[in-house]
Amino acid sequence: MIRRLAIADRGMLLDFFEQHWGGPMMVTRGQITHADQVEGFVWEQAGEWLGLITFVMRADDHGDGGCASCEVTSLDSMAERRGIGSALLDAVIAEARLRSAARLWLITTNDNLHALRFYQRRGWRLVALYPEAVSAARQIKPGIPLIGFDQIPIRDELELAFDL
């Protein structure tokens, strides 16, 4: 069911990012990550993608000379409460360990309470708040909505980390 993204998946990956993320790029902490730059795993059943996780291995930890890290750039489950998101996250954790990463990290927005619950239940911790960072991201990607989940204004980025 879980398999690594392949080169042949790029077209479907771009379509997925367009549909679920408003375009083929993600903007976090002012940095652009294009869909064609990510690695990932997909949960596929009968040719249909039920889940997708993407990540980028980073040479150092936020430029401070630390150990290599793995940034989770997206996680989507189209069939909630079936363990798909957890299984995909476990696949990335295993991959990061194989590549000797010291930690995983990700950025989410202040409105994404579901993600905050999901990751913290799995041992991730909040490590940074970037106030008004989404305003800067909108300069790069204007399609980022002003209002998010539960009618919460989207303003801030939050960084979560998981030490390996």
For the regions a protein language model found, what residue spans apply to each?
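Short hydrophobic/aromatic beta-strand or adjacent loop that forms the aromatic wall/cage
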Residues: 38-40, 154-159
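A generic structural micro-feature
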Residues: 64-67, 150-156
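Conserved GNAT acetyl-CoA-binding A-motif
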Residues: 96-108
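Conserved beta-strand-loop-alpha-helix junction that forms the acyl-donor binding cleft
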Residues: 106-115, 127-138
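Conserved active-site tyrosine of GNAT-family acetyltransferases
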Residues: 119, 124
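Acyl-donor-binding surface of acyltransferase catalytic domains
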Residues: 143-146, 158-164
